UniProtKB/Swiss-Prot annotation:
Family the UniProt entry places it in: Belongs to the TRAFAC class translation factor GTPase superfamily. Classic translation factor GTPase family. IF-2 subfamily.
GO molecular function, one term: GTP binding
Role of this protein: Function in general translation initiation by promoting the binding of the formylmethionine-tRNA to ribosomes. Seems to function along with eIF-2.
Region G5, annotated ranges: 203-205
Annotated keywords: GTP-binding, Initiation factor, Nucleotide-binding, Protein biosynthesis
Region (G4): 135-138
UniProt organism field: Metallosphaera sedula (strain ATCC 51363 / DSM 5348 / JCM 9185 / NBRC 15509 / TH2)
Cross-referenced PANTHER family: EUKARYOTIC TRANSLATION INITIATION FACTOR 5B, TRANSLATION INITIATION FACTOR IF-2-RELATED
Region of interest called G1, as start-end residue ranges on this chain: 17-24
Name of this chain's protein: Probable translation initiation factor IF-2
Amino acid sequence: MSKTEVRLRQPIVVVLGHVDHGKTTLLDKIRGTAVVKKEPGEMTQEVGASFVPSSVIEKVAQPLKGIIPVKLEIPGLLFIDTPGHELFSNLRRRGGSVADIAILVVDITEGFQKQTIESIEILKDKKVPFLVAANKIDRIPGWRPIENETFTKSFRSQSQSVQKALDNYVYKLVMQLAEMGFNAERFDRVRDFTRYVSIVPVSGKTGEGLPELLALLAGLTQQYLKTRLRAVEGPAKGVILEVKEEQGLGHTIDVIIYDGILRKSDTIVLGGINGVIVTKIRNILLPAPLQDMRMTRSGYRSIDEISAAAGVKISAPGLEEALAGSPLYVANDEAKLQEARKLIEEELSKVRFSKNSTGIVVKADSLGSLESLVAGFEKIGIPVRVADIGPITKRDLIEAELSAKEVEEYGIIAAFRVKPIPGLDTSKVKIIYNDIIYQLIDDTIKYIEDLRERRKRRTLDSLVLPGKIKILPGYVFRRSDPAIVGVEVLGGVVRPKYPLIREDGQRVGEVLAIQDNKKNIERATKGMEVSMSIKGNIMIGRQVQEGDVLYTDVPQEDLEILFKNYKDSITEDMMEVIKELIKIKKAENPLYGIFIQ
């Protein structure tokens, strides 16, 4: 490299994708390949990340020289060790993400699933470029695996039918990406990498396609992200991935440094549960090599300084309340300290808030997850009253109860990886727990929708009540469309819009209207003989015969509400109908009416 050339830092790479699509397997294979190909002293294990040096990438990509020219200016690639949404949400920086590029892992045989689509939405929102690893090619029927081979060579050795099957799978991914607004193509058919998302068929299990994946990651980042990757000599900037208590070290923070140089003598500024934390670094730590483990009781070795991009553990006083997802700035003079303090205060107030308005309470364990949850709820129109970090407190319960007084379904707490403080009575407030961001949002939506639905059905008139009728022989006025018949009510209640079933549980239609002495009536009870029109899948003489007995089709939820809120309204004859209904409905739902003693 000439003196005029700019030094580049290593790009930070994250791995996202749907559960069970092979994110961890692929990451493990990349790390394993790097270990096998490295020379002594070439590879450094970092905290929360794995650095794959350019020398290793060049060796792995050697067979592709004729197809992908690989002459790397970047020092290598820094892979964040933990894949998935939850950790990615903590890789926050102003205007986007600390991640420079992402690998979106998709099971080639399954295509896009819910979390795949969510991953793309997140990457789009954070403006992170990505390429698609179409994983599990070894699962394509008839695929003959060749361990650690390039995709190009392995693909050529497959039968024509297998090649065609793979192309069809890739085409489906192309179509799914097009639906989300992206041009995409298999990597070896892409001419303009700025306009097309590259799809790299790989196997995390056999290592096939890994050379192309690594070569593309390295090549694309150094070609198109040069300005972003320009190495900065100034004070370090980073983001806190995790806060941990380590034996012999106390509270520590795992940090990704994405800019500048971090030194052991530095003063750092970061976000804490109760505001900004200013502290002086005690130690910058990296994992000790295996042979040095005996020398360090903690399993870490101390270093004097490190340049971006890097994953390190920092030991310092006062880190007990440090927040995962918080920015971290080096500030060694008063002016820098005030500037950093202001930036972090702005970040904290943007994500943590309390409004005097109706909405749910959201509690999370980190700034990143809290930010993702609030954005997720607001996107689907669920307002947030309180967004905060840490365990659930009495104040949170009070806020939820205040919300419930205004809008019943908003009197809840959505809790991500946090629990109530010990001894807190939470019995009066619904708390929804989940350790997966998208699942917590889904669970909350379901609870709110169910509550709204239940509220609609609270009045007795809105319920389908138990009823039993008999079609009177000789009183068929019209056989179908709608059928009009004379009926006797044998028990319970029948109303217009009530669905009807036969004694075998088969749905036959819905009551359209009821007449008594040629006048429309809203209900018919035991002992009444009325004329009834029934619409739906019914023809007298085919699905239903004269003399047949029909029942109202009472949903399980309506029966529960009837017993819970309106038990006094249940007459003896209605109770008999309920018992008969339970016998009929249990054939398809063994739990139907289980709550009735």
